[in-house]
Amino acid sequence: MFVDKTLMITGGTGSFGNAVLSRFLKSDIINDIKEIRIFSRDEKKQEDMRIALSNPKLKFYIGDVRNYKSIDEAMRGVDYVFHAAALKQVPTCEFYPMEAINTNVLGAENVLSAAINNKVAKVIVLSTDKAVYPINAMGLSKALMEKLSIAKARMCSQGETVLCVTRYGNVMASRGSVIPLFINQIKQGKELTITEPSMTRFLMSLVDSVDLVLYAFEHGRQGDIFVQKSPASTIEILAKALQEIFGSKNKIRFIGTRHGEKHYESLVSSEDMAKADDLGGYYRIPMDGRDLNYAKYFVEGEKKVALLEDYTSHNTKRLNLEEVKKLLLTLDYIQEELKNA
């Protein structure tokens, strides 16, 4: 898959970068690959990763996706790009929406333009369920990032850079997510703060996130969006599962929804479900390749029209308490926290 190829991961010191590098370093992929470039703006995280992983095939580039020159120069000679750099904290983006636009939209524009300029073979862009029917600044910026990716994909001719999008649900135990928060509250003997008990979220592991990106990389065509089917849980059940795993008696306090939060998340809209391909564990949403000359399409007619439900954290498989506990115990993060409890 990556034999003698150079891969770049933007935002490579984040949760996804650590997960995909862990996968590669534990497999034969690291022997096949020529070089992996970690592109990010945090020199301390890069130094920590360099020391922890200590592999000569990892090359570190300081830069910011907001700066076209830095990403363009770092991308010279790159074959494939995983674009993970983003601002992803919903409340923060609500207070600083222009920062979300600068990183998630304009930064993505820089990454994609640099990839096309440097004749990168394929780019996988990481998105989020919050981009579907977005109500918050983070989701809106990611929705625009998706639209930007598809628009650029339409302009790429046969044999040029292939642009694909992967859309995530909630990645369990990723940086800034609720599971580390709950565990810290449990260990400190504090109340577990739950926004809204009936709120549902998809449950996706970091392993799943890597699987999704690699699946998109292997199977993606120009302009495809890929979604992995995932189970879901209410926030209350998730908190109670962690309480039981850690033997906690901490009280639960309901604090109400935060800025920009949705009651449930959607991974595929009903409009996209009408054209999505069901691939078993995944959905593929193909690019709408029509141009602006709509008249000819009205004459030819639509081949497939359907009225379908969205694919949401409310109507996917809902896990009960025991099922959530079982899922959580498969996470390396939970096992490490139990050892240190």
Curated annotation (Swiss-Prot):
The record lists the catalysed reaction(s) as:
UDP-alpha-D-glucose = UDP-alpha-D-galactose
| InterPro entries membership | CapD_C (IPR013692), NAD(P)-bd_dom_sf (IPR036291), Polysac_CapD-like (IPR003869), Polysaccharide_Synthase-Rel (IPR051203)
Q: Under which EC number(s) is this enzyme classified?
A: 5.1.3.2
Task: Name the Gene Ontology molecular function terms of this record.
Answer: UDP-glucose 4-epimerase activity
PANTHER family found in the cross-reference section: UDP-N-ACETYLGLUCOSAMINE 4,6-DEHYDRATASE, UDP-N-ACETYLGLUCOSAMINE 4,6-DEHYDRATASE (INVERTING)
Any idea what job this protein has?
Epimerizes UDP-galactose to UDP-glucose.
Name used for this protein in its record: UDP-glucose 4-epimerase
Organism for this UniProt entry:
Rickettsia akari (strain Hartford)
Q: Which gene encodes it?
A: capD
